[in-house]
Amino acid sequence: MRCAASRVAGIVLAGLAAGALGPVAAFAAPTTPPAASGGTSAADLKSDGPTQPAKVQDGQYTDKNGDPTYHVTDSGKKVDWYTMSGYLRYNANCIVCHGPDGMGSTYAPSLVDALKGMDYAHFAGIIVGGKNDVNAAQELVMPAFGDNRNVMCYMPDIYTYLRARSDGALGRNRPPEHEPKPAAFEKAEDACMK
């Protein structure tokens, strides 16, 4: 099952990398992105939390493995656009089962805890194919969202937000500030939602 989920996640990742990455307008105040002036320095990539971005392209930060990651600064008060987008999409699609801020509920587990040992490919595999893990001790069942554009078009963003929460780089509640929405995000969002 894990191999099939990883293959599906790889296909999804390839599609997302080809242009389907973004989310919806946020209400927090936008601020200038660190790499807006052109080149990216090590100081531009410095982030709160244990996971440090290795690269930023079109406002999307990635770690050394190429997985989407957060750029949180100012003691958790300022986030990149994709983390903000993930917050918005999480609250539109995931909060019903997984509770506020990814903390879990009586109905579904904490995603803050689950992401501590989960890479993006595994996360994507569960989102695309769902989960059905039933045994005597527990019943973990999640529907597949592979055909839901409101989730699939924003999957990297949701992962980025939950990763920031899991790493302790972002606290509970809405981030007060965010970097501006990149033009590449809008283009990818439009292409994905068609």
Whereabouts are the PLM-identified features?
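Flexible coil segments in periplasmic/lumen-exposed cytochrome c-class electron-transfer proteins
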Residues: 29-72, 80, 88, 137-194
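C-terminal segment of classical bacterial N-terminal signal peptides
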Residues: 16-26
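Gly/Gly-Pro-rich "capping" loops immediately C-terminal to redox-active cysteine motifs
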Residues: 101-129, 144-148
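Sec/Tat-exported extracytoplasmic proteins
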Residues: 93-94, 98, 115, 130-134, ...
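Secreted/luminal cysteine- and crosslink-motif detector
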Residues: 4, 95-98, 193
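Sequence/structural segment immediately N-terminal to covalent heme-attachment motifs in c-type
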Residues: 79-100, 125-129
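Bacterial N-terminal signal peptides that target proteins for export
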Residues: 1-12
